[in-house]
Amino acid sequence: MKENNKILQLIYVAWRERWTDSQWGINIKKVLPRGVSGDVYNLADCLMQQALIGSTANPLVLNYLKHSLCAHLVSHAAVIRCIAKYDKLERVYCITALLEFLASIVDGVTCRIKSEEAVLPSSVVHLVYWLLQIFARTVQHYELYGEISAEQSYMLDQTCVVIDRLSQQQFLLSMLYVGCHEELEICGRIRDKYATIKGSLTNSNFTLNAPQVEQQLQQLAFIEAKHLEMQPLNPPSTLEKISCCVQPLLAVEVLLNPCKDTSYYVAELQMLQRLKKYSNTRLFYEIIRAGFLTLSNVADTSPDTMWGAFMFFKMPHIIKQLHALQRIPGEQPPPADYIPELVEALELLIEDNLLLDFMDTKCSCNMIEFLLNDWTKQQLVNDVHVKKFASQREAASQLLKKCDNGQQTPSNINFIKRAEVPLSGVLKTLCTNKVQDMVNVLCQVPVGNSFELILSVATVEGRLKTFVSRLIQCNENSKPVPGDLGKLCVIRSTLFDVSFLMLTSIVQTYGSDVVLSERGDSFFEKWVRECMVERNKLKNPRQILALCDDSIVDELLLSFSKPEASQLKPNNLSWQETCLNLPGVLHHVLIAWEQETLSSADVKSILDNIKRRLFSFSVCATSFLCAYMYSVKETELLKPLNMIQQFLAPLTSEELSSQENAKERLALSYQIIRKMQHDVHPAPSTKSRLISHSPLVEQFREVWRTVVDAGHLPVRAAQSLESLLLAGGAAWLSTQLVEQLLACKYTRDMSRTMDVVFAVMHLDIEKTTEALLQYVVAPLILRRQGEDINEPQSLVLARLCVYCIISCLESRKGNGTSALTAMKKRSRSHDDEELAANAAKVRKVIGDGSDNSSDFTDTTTGAGLAALLGSTSTSELRTTPLTLREPLQTSVQHIFAVFLQFVSGDELSPKAVFVYQFISLLVECGGERVAPVLRLLPNGLVQQLLKVLVTDDIKVGLISRLYDLRIQAGRLSAVSDLCLWRNMQMARHSIHL
């Protein structure tokens, strides 16, 4: 209090003696202790009270206040707070003087010490409220009386000047943005006051001298992060004429996750849409183009049928869900019979004549018309659009047909749509108890490529699990019934055989994790878990043999070695028992052959007898032999290999005619046996994408050349890259991909390559992201700094890292249902749990589709999907976790620790630029979703970066988005960094107060 009294006395003396500013500065420093701010003794408050003691302001005392501010005796925060506390708004002259004072200092507002930083955001919020009070009071006076005085008009003009200056000062806007998270009550009052001003202006038709001020008031009242400047580094989608990201990403996802529900693909595409800033029209165009592009480059094999089924059965529902999720509440509902954005996308697609010509030639039809005729049933387009687009392609299609002259072999695409009806028929038949009907239907499925087509349709429609479960039930129901003789027994054996072979083929194609439940107790599920050899899932032959019953093995040995003698004895063995005990038979035969107890002719006879009984028996025998081959030396492989080859020996026409539908079942068993043998011991002459004697690097470069030449990611290339990932590991593949990225010479090529690399990393996004952040980026920058880790390479590399982090962060997770947990292509960490997300919108989309819509055709699948979608009403199918999961958290912490070392010096280097680009892109691309990542930023990283990066690239918008402003620690960190930025800017541009 002693110093306060001295200050007041000094003010009286100064005013009475009319001191100059310099005299005031000299004398006030004698009163204040050395090194102590005048804020401690309320110097600004004392001067303000004396300046505004009358009906008009005292200009001399206000000059003393300004001098104290320039001399850093008081802080801007304290002065602003004092002004905002002045509540005698009826004193027009005092208010006008304060407004003029504000206009003179507002461009230089900053903070010098920590204590000031804690006060400034709140002071700015109160100042804005004070300005709005003045504004509201004036316009309300005009509304009541129809006029205002010249003094009031001048005061309003000065208010507009201050508001204009405030709106143009990014630092003050950032302080306001931070302060609004602290002063929630005052922020609410500001918005109420703005509503009052807007109402008064509307009612009174008052014309402002500064027309832009109303928009500025709205900006101040509803301050958001988007109002704060930020240097954009992620290029806008308008610069990309054609995307190189959608097709590779879909190629990888359809390869890895063909069984995933529609919402999985929708979430993936939503993530990509946010990163690339695509409109719905652009996204729909890229999705359809990706489908055509991939189909144009695959042969009539499984990928062809899978992609064709994806286009016809999955893609319409993806587009439908994306459209529903993008709708804004309260927006005018779209037309019921078509999606406007899809029509616009088709108009873009119709211009791609080369692609459509190729597809028309490949499919021997007008592909656009063929596709859209189906989409009309799902109300994606209407008949008018079909006629319009079909007519635009008609002339070209007819010309292509004439040039073709009927020489083109029809593509599987023409038959995919027809496979839907047989699938429904098969599922319906499998629900019955009529054994003969089931045999008749199932034996027709393996004919030609029908089985492949039906599997493709079942996969993308989400009915694969239903198909498998009913096949398993059918296999269970085929057990021999006591008393069955003659034809009925043969029918049951045929039913067991064909269902077993079909199930085994499905497991080989998709993996047991995908199609079987973890604890299924059926015979087939037990046999797969304990006896079947799968790729990358070895079985111990000793454990398989431990399941055998010695008495049954002896009985089977007699039966297969001397079938004539065994026929005289009653045989009560079931087919299931035979399958489980065949390994014991094969083991005895193998040992006896090696010890020369049995001759080659005897072994051949036994193996032929096994195959003649049921073709599934030869599959069970081959599975054991493959497991056995894993456990022996290379010199001991010849005999088991010869035994497998004997199972592949053709049957005579008499043997085939002795069994009904034997030809189809035999062909399917050959296919299964060859695949088992190939996985264990591929033939040396076979050129396989899995087995090669050339170095991995050469294989990778060869695959990458095909990608570059094609301009997209062919399915075969995606399969080869998956094999290289399994062989070389995530770190190796990530390194090779980044090397290809940095080898590009031009920015356009670099961006395209980055898109493909980003998509390829989704072969295992979590492991490749971990490798990228922990083992690739830092060594690369340290080792090659100044060579090719510079602009624009560093920016593209930073963008790749950020894209991968965001994709990894948004990987779907949650409790998940057991059904969906099983729908995995292979063990990828983010597939272990499924996210319970979006509800009402997607449920509505699903509800008004046709009965063939993906993921909901079967009642059990529909229930599972409904449970998956949950009850939240959000437009996103992925939510951001509050904390990061491993290994992402450790990887991010590692790269941030490396960044801290990169900026620890005091020189600007490419390393520091990369750190800035990384952090800026993380904020720009991720928004609020990367909050868990930003929480891991080390203390001091941003401030050190500000000191090193002497350019003007860092803006307040970036700094304000780095911290969680809902908590005090986040606000303090943000203000500290903002004030450092402000002081450095002022020093750099030589701003004098």
UniProtKB/Swiss-Prot annotation:
Highest taxon of source: Eukaryota
Species of provenance: Drosophila melanogaster
GO BP term (any one): autophagic cell death
Function: Component of the Mediator complex, a coactivator involved in the regulated transcription of nearly all RNA polymerase II-dependent genes. Mediator functions as a bridge to convey information from gene-specific regulatory proteins to the basal RNA polymerase II transcription machinery. Mediator is recruited to promoters by direct interactions with regulatory proteins and serves as a scaffold for the assembly of a functional preinitiation complex with RNA polymerase II and the general transcription factors. Required for activated transcription of the MtnA, MtnB and MtnD genes.
Family: Belongs to the Mediator complex subunit 24 family.
Gene Ontology, cellular component aspect: mediator complex; nucleus
Protein name: Mediator of RNA polymerase II transcription subunit 24
Pfam families (UniProt xref): Med24_N (PF11277)
Subunit structure: Component of the Mediator complex, which includes at least CDK8, MED4, MED6, MED11, MED14, MED17, MED18, MED20, MED21, MED22, MED27, MED28, MED30 and MED31.
Subcellular location: Nucleus
Post-translational modification Phosphoserine, affected residues: S827, S829
Record keywords, A-Z: Activator, Nucleus, Phosphoprotein, Repeat, Transcription, Transcription regulation
PANTHER family xref list: MEDIATOR OF RNA POLYMERASE II TRANSCRIPTION SUBUNIT 24
